[in-house]
Amino acid sequence: MTLIVTGAAGFIGANIVKALNERGETRIIAVDNLTRADKFRNLVDCEIDDYLDKTEFVERFARGDFGKVRAVFHEGACSDTMETDGRYMMDNNFRYSRAVLDTCLAQGTQFLYASSAAIYGGSTRFVEERDVEAPLNVYGYSKFLFDQVIRRVLPSAKSQIAGFRYFNVYGPRETHKGRMASVAFHNFNQFRAEGKVKLFGEYNGYAPGEQTRDFVSVEDVTKVNLFFFDHPEKSGIFNLGTGRAQPFNDIASTVVNTLRALDNQAPLTLAQQVEQGLIEYVPFPDALRGKYQCFTQADQTKLRAAGYDAPFLTVQEGVDRYVRWLSGQV
């Protein structure tokens, strides 16, 4: 049967397409918007059956043009947390998602979709519960509102609906994201260009570089998506993070030490990296004050209860792999 991946040329979507290929799945319809044409590179090493622009997909899907569709991996969205055009964000992330959901429910198609930890905003608790959800920007609100729709629909749904609140995802195939690419990606490029990595200094009670996030490798994100794809009886909204909060210092230090290792140099401690000017702290920008999550950490209780028991990569493991991959692309 046919599989559909929206946002297929994007970061997570392309990784899902590649992972499906590795299972022998090639009857895949890739849906995206290639106005930014450089994203095509993410699909060059992938096998797909067809490509559709997102503007024509919804109508054709609702019309039944693709026959029996087993599953839709809905990864297509505007993920720019600094986007201020609320009308565009709601149309792209909320209305479009509702249209895809409605057809999946009507046709009995598995619906696996990208939600976001941005829903939690400045909360210090990260559980899939309404009372801790308070997005700080319109991107987070667009994801929040769609999750509320899912909560209302789930009790009567006859087919799978699985939403994943992605935390800070990093890994291969994110180059096109530009300023919205991961910290690991930017640290890598900055170190190669300038010989040092810059991190935010003290802010909101956190020491320089000690703001913490739940950084999760796209390898693990893909594995979780495929686990639920294999278990269509499992539905719900799930946090998708490692369950470990790690500081930005860990990302930067791992990037520096991996690049040093590739240059046959010995690893350094964080203190040594700072002392030698390999990591530099800069004042926290005014534009981000009040809009910045200083701490995120996924509560994995629901995910583990659903049966997903595989370990998640640490920053040291995942970023080391990623930096080596990036180095091979240069």
From Swiss-Prot:
What cofactors are annotated for this protein?
NADP(+)
* Catalytic residue list: 139, 177
**Would the keyword NADP turn up in this protein's UniProt record?**
yes
SUPFAM superfamilies of this UniProt entry?
NAD(P)-binding Rossmann-fold domains (SSF51735)
Q: Where does NADP(+) bind?
A: 11-12, 32-33, 39, 54, 75-79, 92, 143, 169, 177
Q: What is its EC number?
A: 5.1.3.20
Superkingdom of the source?
Bacteria
Which major enzyme category is it? isomerase
Family (UniProt)? Belongs to the NAD(P)-dependent epimerase/dehydratase family. HldD subfamily.
Q: What is this protein called?
A: ADP-L-glycero-D-manno-heptose-6-epimerase
Species whose genome carries this gene: Burkholderia cenocepacia (strain HI2424)
